[in-house]
Swiss-Prot record:
Keyword flag Cytoplasm: yes
Lineage: Bacteria, Bacillati, Cyanobacteriota, Cyanophyceae, Synechococcales
Gene3D superfamilies, sorted: GTP1/OBG domain (2.70.210.12), P-loop containing nucleotide triphosphate hydrolases (3.40.50.300)
Assembly and interaction partners: Monomer.
UniProt name for this protein: GTPase Obg
Organism of origin: Prochlorococcus marinus (strain MIT 9303)
Length: 329
């Protein structure tokens, strides 16, 4: 399934039904008064979070969402039927903004969360409303009002507690695949991961924690280079970051600084987020080189380094122990 995490849509609430002019015409009521009914309310447009959806793909080709109009009033003071609300399902984690102003309308984070994004127009008044002592046969009635119409920006931000970040080919996808049941595409070339991958990792209690493997960052990602800018938003909600470094890279210290710089440039307090620093592909390092690299990385980052080999399953228990400690579980 194609992963789409941004969409622009138009929502149009229903127009209110018109009021009408009518008079009582019973056989034994020769001077029947006004009886025109009111129009029904226009339908609202409502977004609803659905935990079964993972992408905004449904909005790629369908971008106009009109709610039904209210019906016109009837005689005998009958009010017209109101238009039914239009319910639009979106994934949990969807932010909704006005396209023109960028104003945040709502953030649908839990399944069944509801957000009214366009209100239906009010129904018009029938002539029965205008009966008075001075006017016993009013002919005045009003039309229904138009419903609201808005252009909206939908933005999906994944709901994961732990985000796995790093440069391309650092082994992030391999790591999430061995920690969870996720099966991302894995190969030995950059940008194998083109979309975020989610995996559920079991806590000691048996409960699940969602990990997200974010496509590799490169220098300039926060300004839109590579794939990073499109997907950095998906770690905004995380409680903990795991920064994976490639032990077989030419200069892991420089790689560390590149990602650190991108987190600072992107903002949203990502650089302040609790973070574990992980050196992957431990099996590629001899003991002397490993010791030197550990010292250099810890000095450059001010963090304790965790050594692992995701491919060989080394150091994973220690890594998870640190994750649970940071999350307080």
């Amino acid at each position: 399934m194609q992963f789409i995490d941004q969409a622009r849509i138009t929502v149009r609430a229903g127009r209110g039904g018109d009021g009408i002019m009518a008079f009582r015409r019973e056989k034994y009521v020769p001077a029947g008064g006004p009886s025109g009914g009111d129009g029904g309310e226009g339908g609202n447009v409502v977004l609803e979070a659905d935990g079964n959806l993972q992408t905004l793909l449904d909005f790629k080709y369908n971008r106009l969402f009109p709610a039904p109009d209210g019906r016109r009033g009837g005689p005998n003071r009958c009010t017209g039927a109101s238009g039914k609300d239009l319910i639009i399902k979106v994934p949990c984690g969807t932010e909704v903004r006005h396209l023109s102003t960028g104003i945040l309308l709502g953030d649908l984070t839990r399944s069944d969360d509801l957000l009214v994004v366009a209100f239906g127009g009010r129904g018009g008044l029938g002539n029965a409303h205008y009966l008075s002592n001075r006017n016993r046969a009013p002919e005045k009635f009003t039309e229904g009002r138009d419903g609201e119409e808005w252009f909206l920006q939908l933005e999906l931000k994944l709901l994961a507690e732990v985000g796995i970040i790093g440069l391309p080919n650092a082994g992030k996808s391999t790591l999430i695949s061995v920690l969870s049941a996720a099966r991302p595409k894995i190969a030995d070339y950059p940008f194998t991961t083109l979309v975020p991958n989610l995996g559920v990792v079991r806590r000691p209690s048996g409960d699940g924690t969602v990990f997200a493997d974010i496509p590799g960052l490169i220098a300039g990602a926060a300004q839109g280079a590579g794939l990073g800018h499109d997907f950095l938003r998906h770690i905004e909600r995380t409680r903990l970051l795991i920064h994976v470094l490639d032990g077989g890279a030419e200069d892991p210290v420089e790689d560390l600084l590149v990602v650190e710089k991108e987190l600072v440039a992107y903002g949203h307090d990502l650089v302040e987020r609790p973070r574990l620093l992980v050196l992957n592909k431990q099996e590629l390092l001899d003991e002397q080189h490993q010791d030197q690299l550990v010292d250099a990385l810890q000095a450059a980052s001010g963090r304790r380094l965790i050594l692992i080999s995701a491919a060989m399953g080394l150091g994973l228990e220690g890594l998870l122990a640190q994750v649970w400690k940071e999350l307080g579980v």
